[in-house]
Amino acid sequence: MTNIAILGTASDVGKSIVATALCRIFSNAGVDVAPYKAQNMSNNSGVTPDGFEMGRAQIVQAQAARVAPHADMNPVLLKPNTDTGAQVVLQGKVCADKSAREYFGDTQRWAEAAFESLDRLMVRHELLVIEGAGSCAEMNLYQRDFVNFKTARRAGAAVILVADIDRGGVFAQVVGTLAVIPPEDRALVKGVIINRFRGDKSLFEGGVKMLESMTGVPVLGVIPYFRGFTIDAEDAVPLSSVVDPKQEPSGDKIGVAAIYFPHISNFTDLAPLERDPSVELHYLHRPKSLDGYKALILPGSKNVRGDLAWLETMGWRDEIEKFRKRGGIIVGLCGGYQMLGASIADPYGVEGAPGASAGLAMLPVETVLEREKALCNSVGKIAGTPFFVSGYEIHMGRTALEPGASPLLEVTERNGVATDDFDGAKSADGQVTGTYFHGFFDRPEVRTWFLRLLDGGYESPRGASVADPFELLAKHFSENLDLEKLFAIAGLSVKGEKES
């Protein structure tokens, strides 16, 4: 079999979605397939079953491929924590903090680790679906770019180039990319996928023929815009999200606000709320009156003290305090939980210069950032309720409750081992809560419990589709791709779908 590398003409052309779809398509055909991305830049990460950290996109792709996520699938993860720097997670563990100049000044170390992981995956699996990063034709960076064509060459992969027709200029995207890359890399490109087409596909049939004539590369498919599936975004709040709206939430919706920190992380925690038809979620960067909202969420942050200082400078503290006095519900997730406490100390300079900051003092807790990162898949029960939360913890902070403080969760399991512990905190009046659990809102019963705190008349959606979203995605792509050509590129014949 021949590995497949999904490379893009630019950032955000849909490489992650395409790779996810192909993982499920090949898995349905009975192939032992796994995802791989040499380097991710993202503050959206998760924890593998064996307790290592990797990007959320590759975790989702592993689920599509029906294999357990492994740190080798995303060996280099860059988690931006300043405007010019990032924490480097190497093969699932924190390695160092590097400025962009330091990191890109010598990529050999990172490339060696990435290829070591790639080699292991090629032994373990029949086929890899490799995702590139950004544009595969950034010529000023080409020699030190180990994520795109260098990875494809190492894996002996056939390259499929993805272009986004929705942003316009698709001919320039494809023809331009193929024109500027070296001939030896151009020879690896075996197909093109035109992504995010809107309207009548038949109107672009002439365009397909023109592209094939101009490049000599077959167009494997034109993929209509698909709204039935969302993969966790890597490095920015999705464009479909509502940010700093002028209007208040609709009167018939439950208004939820989330502060959009400069270094926001794991905002995918909010996706289940955003998808609920009864909820209107707004990301707020600029301070405004919160009178139209029932809840305020402080999400995760990759630079907690920096974002706390930003929050103070912007004037958010006054609005948050007024919201609490009005009876609003406030939830802090990971970094947001730390901000709600009395203080945050960073004695080792984990997230910047060593020092300490006063928190918002809405929860009776104090946090110290340690050198060692906690990485856990965890299960806990919301104290005083029958509801269990399954989530994951990724944090450098160790948070201590003051005497008499009440935890939010009774933790029963971490990384598959039974435990008797606690997590998070809640204020005496119950208005303010915080937790380290990412994925807190994932379970429908927990979401229902939370939303009924905001609106006693809330009813969870009825009659919603229970179809596997990966199957919906695979079906959508299968109907719009030339599977015979795709499978031939991978060295396979088209097989019947695997029964689920």
From Swiss-Prot:
Keywords: Cobalamin biosynthesis, Glutamine amidotransferase. CDD domains: CobQ_N, GATase1_CobQ. GO terms for biological process: cobalamin biosynthetic process. InterPro entries: Class_I_gatase-like, CobQ/CobB/MinD/ParA_Nub-bd_dom, CobQ_GATase1, CobQ_N, CobQ_synth, GATase_3, P-loop_NTPase. Disulfide bonds: none annotated. One of its GO terms (molecular function) is ABC-type vitamin B12 transporter activity. The active site is at residues 334, 438. Belongs to the CobB/CobQ family. CobQ subfamily. PANTHER family: COBYRIC ACID SYNTHASE, DETHIOBIOTIN SYNTHETASE. This is Cobyric acid synthase. It comes from Chlorobaculum tepidum (strain ATCC 49652 / DSM 12025 / NBRC 103806 / TLS) (Chlorobium tepidum). The lineage of its organism: Bacteria, Pseudomonadati, Chlorobiota, Chlorobiia, Chlorobiales.
